[in-house]
């Protein structure tokens, strides 16, 4: 897939926001330059997830930003999202690819070189690797060394996105790893000024990814 689309990857978390406030944040982020959005809301019923996905897709479509659905293949297909992201404990990559078909984007979490190679072989379009730094989004997530991230980038032909505790202040440490982009949750979703924070990320990424 196009590496540029993965440059600044927003992963959502509603925290305590109302639906209206949450959607406003997503809209601001899309307007300000995020290049892809993943809807990741673990605590919703299927219908709640579906309804929220429809609303988010209206926003992402308006800004021509791809929408990725986390975990839920059914919701991805129901709203005709651009793609699906699956983790270690979810559908086998080959099964997800078979159901999605060749046109949808398929992202896969890969914390090791072995998993990265397996995912690539089974049809993944990109990999999400981390947590690079400690994160409150997944409090017990094991840390992936930056050296491991770099090795994964060098080993696979598909793009790799770093994730986990990433902020506009610490992403400089990813210079030279070969990543296609960074996935950000808290530092964007809870920013006081999402537009300014998005621009800060994009400015840093211009140097890191060039």
Swiss-Prot record:
Q: Where does Mg(2+) bind?
A: 71, 90
Gene3D superfamilies, sorted: Aldolase class I
InterPro entries tied to this protein: Aldolase_TIM (IPR013785), ThiamineP_synth_sf (IPR036206), ThiamineP_synth_TenI (IPR022998), TMP_synthase (IPR034291)
Q: Name one GO cellular component term.
A: cytoplasm
GO:BP terms for this protein? Answer: thiamine biosynthetic process; thiamine diphosphate biosynthetic process
Any one Gene Ontology molecular-function term assigned to this protein's record: magnesium ion binding
> What's the Enzyme Commission number for this chain?
2.5.1.3
SUPFAM superfamilies, alphabetized: Thiamin phosphate synthase
Pfam family of the protein (one) = TMP-TENI
Pathway terms, separated by semicolons: Cofactor biosynthesis; thiamine diphosphate biosynthesis; thiamine phosphate from 4-amino-2-methyl-5-diphosphomethylpyrimidine and 4-methyl-5-(2-phosphoethyl)-thiazole: step 1/1
Which principal EC class is assigned to this enzyme? Answer: transferase
The entry's free-text remark on the cofactor is: Binds 1 Mg(2+) ion per subunit.
Which residues lie in coiled coils? Answer: none
Q: Which residues bind 2-[(2R,5Z)-2-carboxy-4-methylthiazol-5(2H)-ylidene]ethyl phosphate?
A: 135-137, 165
Record keywords, A-Z: Magnesium, Metal-binding, Thiamine biosynthesis, Transferase
Reactions mediated catalytically: 2-[(2R,5Z)-2-carboxy-4-methylthiazol-5(2H)-ylidene]ethyl phosphate + 4-amino-2-methyl-5-(diphosphooxymethyl)pyrimidine + 2 H(+) = thiamine phosphate + CO2 + diphosphate; 2-(2-carboxy-4-methylthiazol-5-yl)ethyl phosphate + 4-amino-2-methyl-5-(diphosphooxymethyl)pyrimidine + 2 H(+) = thiamine phosphate + CO2 + diphosphate; 4-methyl-5-(2-phosphooxyethyl)-thiazole + 4-amino-2-methyl-5-(diphosphooxymethyl)pyrimidine + H(+) = thiamine phosphate + diphosphate
Binding, 4-amino-2-methyl-5-(diphosphooxymethyl)pyrimidine: 38-42, 70, 109, 138
Its cofactor is: Mg(2+)
Q: Which HAMAP family match?
A: TMP_synthase
> Per the similarity annotation, which family is this?
Belongs to the thiamine-phosphate synthase family.
> Could you tell me what this protein does?
Condenses 4-methyl-5-(beta-hydroxyethyl)thiazole monophosphate (THZ-P) and 2-methyl-4-amino-5-hydroxymethyl pyrimidine pyrophosphate (HMP-PP) to form thiamine monophosphate (TMP).
Put simply, this protein is called Thiamine-phosphate synthase 2
Per the UniProt record, the source organism is Streptococcus pneumoniae serotype 4 (strain ATCC BAA-334 / TIGR4)
Gene that encodes the chain: thiE2
